[in-house]
Amino acid sequence: MMAPSIDTMAEELDTSITESTMALSVYLLATAFGPLIIGPVSEIYGRKSIFHITNIWFLVWNLVCGFAHSKGLLMAARLLAGFGASAVYSLGYGVLGDVWSAEQRGRSLSLYLLIPLTGSAVGPIVSGFIVKYSTWRWMFWSTAILQLTLDLSSLLFHESYAPLLLRRRAEELRSNTGGSRYHAAIEMREAGLSPPRKLSRSLSRPLRLLAFHPIIQMQAILEGIDYGLLYFALSSFSALHVAAYGESVEISGLHYIVICIGTVSGSQLCGPLMDYAYQRLSSNTGETQVPELRIPLLLPGALITPIGFLLYGWAAQYHLIWVVVDVGAALLSLGMQIFDTTLHAYVMDSYPEHVSSASAATQVLRSLLAFAFPLFSNSLYDSLGYGLGNSLLAFLSIGIALPATGILWRWGATLRGRQQSSY
């Protein structure tokens, strides 16, 4: 949402463009480390309570952003707001894994992703008009008003984490019957562990997954590069239309509609196709609950993404009509969304009891690269231009995605079989 207002904020707060871009990117830095705490803690205390706490945290610091009168306070508040918002990266996928079966994974992901993906594209459009007719501070205040509404509606949510619900049920049965024979599986597994030991073991889980589980390592690298490249290309998307096509800030923000079209189309196409392909492959092979049956859908995403990069880059390089640039950006976001949605489903299938921790582990590299890549986008495009610059990104994307798809399809089950327990 901040992208169209970077120049305005830089002027008012007396910062450089790089420093203003840092205020945009530091939010992503928080989303790298927030899930490392939020995800595993939700597997101890439940999704519901952690969800309420992080919602309030985000609301408070988002308001502070709107009142910031120095670049230091703005960056600090953005960092802390990002920590609260990062809950969605672990709790969201955790709830999906709690509620929907593997056969419904695609449908649940497509429904879940619809609103955040739409919001990520509509946000810059709205902020462009806010900057034009009001002040950039209302970007944060209006978001806080919406967040307050969502916080109130979230009071209707129920706990969904099965191990915690079973623990509570076992405790209730022991209390009501006076017997000690009722125990949940998680209680048996954690027998003899002190509360600090349980907490430390849970908090270390995402890092243990990232350090010792090849599946998590591969997804972290793939999603990190994908997400970083997307932010790299799109961090200058609005500025391109202002500089090359002479558009105003608020009109340039309208071009983010094509990003919305690409990402939403990717998620909504991928969901039903994923469920259909999974059920068809399960029927043909006679195997069920095999995460590798998700892998074939990575291929179209891996191929569409570089096409989008090339079209976007060379159309911008030769100042072709803006429609061509936008089609390239739409294809780029479409391919990446198909690829990332499929990867998420694969990891959710691989770690059904620790979806939040697994999502947190993969989120680290994803957010770090999304934080770092935009800092160098202006330098790359100034040196190589949009054509060669995006060609480099296209070859990097396909050069990593295609081999990784083959490795997961051929050796994914073997890698999963050799990994340590996620407990």
Swiss-Prot record:
Example GO molecular function: transmembrane transporter activity
Coiled-coil ranges (or none): none
Membrane protein topology class: Multi-pass membrane protein
SUPFAM superfamilies given in the database record: MFS general substrate transporter
GO biological process: export across plasma membrane; xenobiotic transport
Transmembrane segments: 21-41, 49-69, 79-99, 111-131, 138-158, 220-240, 256-278, 295-315, 319-339, 360-380, 392-411
Signal peptide start and end residues: none
Major place of residence: membrane
One GO CC term on file: membrane
Induction of synthesis: Expression is induced by the developmental and secondary metabolism regulator veA.
Location of the protein in the cell: Membrane
Superkingdom: Eukaryota
Annotated keywords: Membrane, Transmembrane, Transmembrane helix, Transport
Function: Probable efflux pump; part of the gene cluster 27 that mediates the biosynthesis of asparasone A, a sclerotium-specific anthraquinone pigment important for sclerotial survival.
Sequence similarity: Belongs to the major facilitator superfamily.
Annotated protein name in UniProt: Probable efflux pump mfs2
Organism: Aspergillus flavus (strain ATCC 200026 / FGSC A1120 / IAM 13836 / NRRL 3357 / JCM 12722 / SRRC 167)
Gene that specifies this protein: mfs2
